[in-house]
Amino acid sequence: MEFNNFVFPAPNFEYHLLEILKEKMIFIPSKDNHYIPCLFLHNEKEISKNFIIFFHGNAEDMFYSNEMARALQEITGMNVIIVEYPGYSIYKGEANSTKILENTTIVYDFIKTQFNLEDNNMFVFGRSIGTSPAIYLASVRKPNALFVVSSFTSIRAVAGNLVGPLKYLLKQRFTSEEYIKNVTCPIFFVHGKSDPLIPYTETISLTKICKSKYELLTPSHMTHNDFDLYEDIIEPIQKFNENNCTIDNGKINIDDIKNDIDKLHKMPQEIEFYIRDLKDKVK
């Protein structure tokens, strides 16, 4: 098996979250004539020239991860693009590592081209299962910085913590220990020492492999899902940026790109149909 639903379960679809956040949704065209659903969080009056491509954790989707991403957007002042995974929320399909990794570069390149940006304007964030696509993306592109929270060396290592010998049934995908060797931008690692799901030693192992400049924060009280969002993650990221990155403070006038954003907001018919099916299933 490539993905195990017990190890990486997508949450049940919550229609009310879609209704609350539907104005933040954008749909990025993929290579197979389908669309990648994302949330686009930004200042309402003017848009920063800096974008954080955000990859959420397991057992959550782009809607559930909105709170963390919104805090990141507000404190850093950067825009945040939350990328959805196949099989999660309104993205039809099955969780597939090959597709997820392919989508990372599609989203990165699209945002960079759409808003006429440089690599210096691009940042990458990943948490839990999302750290591997984040590290992969940073290994094949040149973002300004990479932020990873609760990372792991490989999918097999994570599965082993939950299902023991069954880990050998998993195909070796999401091999962060290989990707990180090719990352050249500064990296900020956060991993709680009390994490029972992914031991913080997984992140320690990555720091020993990576060749780029990095900082490591390991709060003793922090578990996988229990932490102070601002003190443990958001504020340290902002401090890391200030100390390690050259930030472009330029702005994009939202009126100048309103038509382009409106086009991205338009929901493709295939996703409309899929949402109807999801609603019928939860009735």
For the regions a protein language model found, what residue spans apply to each?
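Catalytic histidine neighborhood in serine/cysteine hydrolases
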Residues: 204-226
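An N-terminal hydrophobic leader/cap segment in hydrolases
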Residues: 1-29, 39, 277
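Short alpha-helix in the alpha/beta-hydrolase fold that links the catalytic acid
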Residues: 67-68, 176, 185, 199-208
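Short beta-strand/loop motif that positions the catalytic acidic residue
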Residues: 182-184, 188-191, 195
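The serine-hydrolase catalytic nucleophile loop
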Residues: 58-72
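Alpha/beta-hydrolase active-site loop
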Residues: 94-115, 178
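Hydrolase active-site cap/lid region
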Residues: 131-185, 218, 226-231
